[in-house]
Amino acid sequence: MTNIRKTHPLMKIINDAFIDLPSPSNISSWWNFGSLLGLCLIMQILTGLFLAMHYTPDTSTAFSSVAHICRDVNYGWFIRYLHANGASMFFICLYAHIGRGLYYGSYMFQETWNIGVLLLLTVMATAFVGYVLPWGQMSFWGATVITNLLSAIPYIGTTLVEWIWGGFSVDKATLTRFFAFHFILPFMITALAAVHLLFLHETGSNNPTGIPSNMDMIPFHPYYTIKDILGALLLILTLLALTLFTPDLLGDPDNYTPANPLSTPAHIKPEWYFLFAYAILRSIPNKLGGVLALLLSILILIFIPMLQTSKQRSMMFRPFSQLLFWTLVADLLTLTWIGGQPVEHPYIIVGQLASILYFLLILVLMPTVSLIENKLLKW
């Protein structure tokens, strides 16, 4: 008798994706982040669902409904902080996942990569609208500042902003629609993740060497299921430590003050995971130029496969490219730091230099160094 796992239409899909999937025998822990992102998504949807049961998307009651969740709902504080810090863990895994893709040349699977960029944009949109929901000072002013960026679009900008707001300022209509977006987007992310996986399984996984591994494959289960479980345990441990010991470490104290349109906070800044893009936005004195740079800082990922000039896929055997890659990581950390600082000397010039270096590294230096490495191969 044939195993039901291999014959049943539904079980067969699960089997081919998570059990009998042929996987390269040498993939490292950097390949764990895909499954960790799946885990983060499930956790965020579940905690978010329980929060939505008690939250009210109305300007007069939103802030107090969050306070009510934390004070009166059984383990409400725990669910709320799991959700808030879960978002941070989500972005840590996301950036590590993208970094792995850049380092090992996974972007050469173009369909998978492009769906991944789309996923990144959707997750960023979800996190942004979610940050507005507690209706604290930073929620309100963050929403005002970021949505206002669209007014830089010539001719239709102002109309577009008022259309998104549902009025002439960020108000009740804005909060209600942002809650609706925040509820629906994670399900779109889930669907996109399934498509991401579908395209990945068309080609099979890449591996650290960047060399085809068709001749040396092992089944996903038990080898990589056990490895993913270890990663999951470490992720949960980190998340629990963050949530139970320092739940407000990554948050903004201003968000414990109810939203007040008449009082602007001294320093308006987004959550830490958007600071690098915020720093790039602020480093350009022109509004439209800043918005374009902000967009390009993320959308540049789409062009990465076209900028591949190396004969080798992975950076594993390319020391000069490795140096530039880690310079890029350091540059992004610098931008993240600058994004959280006030707009004054010396932060302005450091931010501008880091922004220039970011685009220079990706568009000019990395492709050029790859060509030089190709020449060195002939020596």
Curated annotation (Swiss-Prot):
This is Cytochrome b. Belongs to the cytochrome b family. A ubiquinone binds at H201. Binds 2 heme b groups non-covalently. The chain crosses the membrane at residues 33-53, 77-98, 113-133, 178-198, 226-246, 288-308, 320-340, 347-367. Component of the ubiquinol-cytochrome c reductase complex (complex III or cytochrome b-c1 complex) that is part of the mitochondrial respiratory chain. The b-c1 complex mediates electron transfer from ubiquinol to cytochrome c. Contributes to the generation of a proton gradient across the mitochondrial membrane that is then used for ATP synthesis. It is found in: Mitochondrion inner membrane. Keywords: Electron transport, Heme, Iron, Membrane, Metal-binding, Mitochondrion, Mitochondrion inner membrane, Respiratory chain, Transmembrane, Transmembrane helix, Transport, Ubiquinone. The cytochrome bc1 complex contains 11 subunits: 3 respiratory subunits (MT-CYB, CYC1 and UQCRFS1), 2 core proteins (UQCRC1 and UQCRC2) and 6 low-molecular weight proteins (UQCRH/QCR6, UQCRB/QCR7, UQCRQ/QCR8, UQCR10/QCR9, UQCR11/QCR10 and a cleavage product of UQCRFS1). This cytochrome bc1 complex then forms a dimer. Heme b b562 binds at H83, H182. InterPro entries: Cyt_b/b6_C, Cyt_b/b6_C_sf, Cyt_b/b6_N, Cytb/b6-like_sf, Cytochrome_b, Cytochrome_b_C_euk/bac, Cytochrome_b_N_euk/bac, Di-haem_cyt_TM. Its cofactor is heme b. GO terms for cellular component: mitochondrial inner membrane; respiratory chain complex III. Heme b b566 binds at H97, H196. GO terms for biological process: mitochondrial electron transport, ubiquinol to cytochrome c. GO terms for molecular function: metal ion binding; ubiquinol-cytochrome-c reductase activity. Heme 1 (or BL or b562) is low-potential and absorbs at about 562 nm, and heme 2 (or BH or b566) is high-potential and absorbs at about 566 nm.
